[in-house]
Amino acid sequence: MGAGQSSFVILYHRTPFDESKDKNGKRIWVDQKSPNGIIPTLRNLFRSCEKGTWIAWRRVDDQSNEGTERFEMDNPSPFTLCRIPLEDEQISSFYHITSKECFWPILHTFPTYFNVNNANWKIFEEVNKRFAMAACAEAAEGATVWVHDYNLWLAPGYIRAERPDLKIAFFHHTPFPGNDVFAILPWREQILESLLCCDVVGFHIPRYTENFARAAITLVGAKRGPKVPVDNKFIEVGTALSEGTVTSHL
């Protein structure tokens, strides 16, 4: 696959703006109704890059008749929005069932709520691969691709296989459980091997970093790099989740 033009590519399941129409029926983009600060924070990152792309999904009735939409955005600075067409069945399976019914309880260490019965792993793989291929098509030679959250766990592996020149980062917007809980997932090795294709994997706190490192070492045989002291701001007296040192790399 040939290189694109974007030096910085974000993969996030939601679009940076909601699509609406003005009184004349013309498409307009409005701020997301969600109160969380993730989307405006990510949007502002485009201020510091010359050419950027945001990849998300859009809902369609029949994806065989639809291609990836591309829009040139200008708020807060110019970037390209790419929207991958997904049908209701794909969205329901990939996001609401596999991600929410399977992954969410495990990530938050509530294994009794884990439900794998309705999961369709093939659909999850297909959606992740479509996000990954869209990123590969948009990214310039040596670009940075930043993948967000567990519903795109497999995207880094697909990206690395297709574009080894890219720098891949991943940020986890949830906790990462202990390896004994994470090991409940039937697809644990595939998920970990994909994340290990990243140059950087980020977590909220050092404990989640250590949980990931232990899972990778125990379940797929990753080699632990040196441990480094944790910054004092992450060490609170009496905090059950604190860690004095953290694994620097695998």
Label for each model-derived stretch:
Residues M1-L250:
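Catalytic cores of carbohydrate-active enzymes across secretory and cytosolic contexts
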